[in-house]
């Protein structure tokens, strides 16, 4: 009886964790999964250094946290509402575009205004990132093994949180300014978004038709 309540994914199948990990779409999703955890952690990890090079007080940087939290919560609610009406494939491909703009602002912007805009934009991605990927795994790989598939996705994000601070710290030690690195992060998010767009567009053709 329990199996009858599960939704199927691509090709009308209930994908196992191993099957999902051997499918190309999972690896298309990996760069997008790594990005927010890697570079969001890096942003917080290097906050003192960032404040110094931007010539703002550390207290001003920390004062952005309530704004970031509020925008993240609002984005979670709005993305969930939009998800029910528009669907995962149409939404998820745009999820990381605010992060592109956010890290451009972090890299090129100055003063408190740049911080406000950057944290607000990154909050949009952070909130949507808490909602849309969960629906993505269920819609494209089915729900029978959703727990183990999401666990692997979570492991990728944990890996990202370890990579980000180390990578950016190495860049600072190598003489690459944090501002230049954040512009490169914006390019990374752009490439991850483009890859995700192409992958989701192709994989959407494999989904079973929606029930009326």
Specify the residue positions occupied by each region the protein language model found.
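Extracytoplasmic gate region of multi-pass secondary transporters
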Residues: 18-79
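Helix-to-loop junctions at the C-terminal end of transmembrane segments
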Residues: 75-87, 172-173
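Structural signature of the two symmetry-related core transmembrane helices
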Residues: 90-104
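Paired small-residue
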Residues: 113-121
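Intracellular juxtamembrane helix-capping segments at the cytosolic ends
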Residues: 128-141
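A late C-terminal transmembrane helix in Major Facilitator Superfamily
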Residues: 140-175
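A membrane-interface helix-boundary motif in multi-pass transporters
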Residues: 170-188
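Multi-pass alpha-helical transporter architecture, strongest
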Residues: 184-212
